[in-house]
Amino acid sequence: MIGIFAWGSSVYRAKVRVPLAIQLDKPLARPLKIVGLSDLHLGYTIGREELSRWVDLVNSERPDLVLIAGDIVDGDVRPVLEEGMAEELNHIEAPVYACLGNHEYLGGEAHRRQFLRQTKVQLLCDSVATFADQLYIIGRDDESNPQRKSLSQLTAGLDRSKPILLLDHQPHHLEQAQQAGIDFQLSGHTHRGQVFPINLIVDRMYERSHGYHRRGRTQYYVSSGIGIWGGKYRIGTQSEYVVIQLSGRAS
């Protein structure tokens, strides 16, 4: 048993680089390199030293943009503040956009917002940002808020000739993004079950619990997360970061 958990710990520590080519059916002024993250779960289990290694991984890619699909903070915000993790996030060299996850609501999301205001992370909570006048980035509030806006509300008035990227932490109801004309959605939350055999159960709970997916013109990636919840081990799953090469249709 000890050997299994030791092996699971080594699997967790080995962060997997996932290359992902996304070809959009819309013109893009130039290709963009994006690093996609989810489920950092910063706190007592994952501290500043580990976060620093992740920041180095991100910066080594020299991305144009970094997207974080929720669960930046795990439970208690206290260790995040005490260890000065905001300063570490500020070492990311590219612009960073993020949405909230369900863990941001544990103990009160207001404290998480306050922490993120100390960082360069631009939190999109039922709001839209324009990046380099090339594309839109929508960040949905988490399902933990039953009053969150619909995608039809969030996309109202957008120029549909531009690509629309969506950050939505929990990958439920993927048809909503397709119906709203989203071009690419990044989600997390599932950890793909984290350990065997829970991954087999999680695979049956979601239309896509991990990896690339497509519905019509809408493309998706559900990340198993770079971090972890609970113990630092994985069995049958991987801790990952996604390196997205985003390109557009020739105009």
What are these regions (language model features)?
Residues 18, 23-251:
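Soluble catalytic domains of enzymes that build or remodel membrane lipids, polysaccharides, and related
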Residues 14-16:
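Juxtamembrane/interface segments at transmembrane-helix termini
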Residues 1-11:
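Internal/C-terminal transmembrane anchor helices
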